[in-house]
Every structure is written in C-alpha cells, then in structure tokens.
Amino acid sequence: IDMLEETYLKIISSKTAALFAASTKVGAILSESESREKDALDFYGKNIGLTFQIADDTLDYNSEIKFFGKEVGKDFFEGKITLPIILLCQKINSSEKEKIFSFFKQTNRSNYDLTFTLNLIKKYNIINECYKKADHFINLASNSLSIFENSEQKTILKNLTSFSLERNF
C-alpha cells in the first residue's frame, strides 16, 4: 500500500487518460488538423482523463454523495489503492497508518474497516485534497484549448472540463 502518487498517476495515465486522449485526438486526425492542434487535443484528453479518474476514485470515499449511484467503498473492499488512500497515508500518524495497512493486507475488509478509513479521510480533509489535485489537471486541460479560436466546439470542450470533476455518479 506504500504506493507513490507518481505511480498512481502513471497507472491512470496509461488507462483512463490514454483512452480520453485517443478519443479527443481522433477528431483532429480525421479532420486533418495541424500537428499542434492534434497535440493540444491529445493533451486536453489526457488531462480530462486524469481529472475524471481522480474524481471517480474520490467519489468512492465520499459518503456525502452515496445516493448518486456509486457504492461508497467499492474500491476499498476490492483492495484498490487509489489517490484518497495514498494521500491519507501521507498525512496520518504511525498508529493510524499501521491500521490502514492492516486493512489492505487482509483479503476481506469489513464495514468497520471502511468506517474507520472514512473517518480518517474526513479528519484529514482528504476529499478536498483529491479535488485540488484534480483541479490542477482541469486547468491544464482548459489551458491547452487556448490555441483554438472561440467557437461552439471550444465552449463544449471547456464545459466538459468542469463536468469531469463536478459529476456525482
């Protein structure tokens, strides 16, 4: 469970972010856009993908929005190490860390284990920390669109940047 944030970002870059990047770049390729436009849309898609995945992983630990359809704790029960757990382990004291590590060493985690973890996430303000990280990628995505002239398409892409972080499902 001692995963670095950098390792986590590499993993989601090669999965979700790569899919988003391919999806945004293909339009530029098909329309025979300039190389710099293809690169900008590739960069945009990658950063939207990173934002989307961080938001999705954060939703798993946000008990405030469990009624939106995403089961709180799913990643936890599957033993997935995601950004909320990584950031939590950077902030907690040694006895709390020992307890969290013990949860992830087990094959089965209990509701008590999840509740304990959620309480620490709340105590250390980890949800906000995750959204700050995601916001960084939103800004990168949004800034990559600056090479394009104002248009309806650009407005749609800019709106998508906000949606990727603000979604609750």
Show the residue positions of the predicted features.
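All-alpha prenyltransferase/terpene-synthase fold signal
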Residues: I1-F169
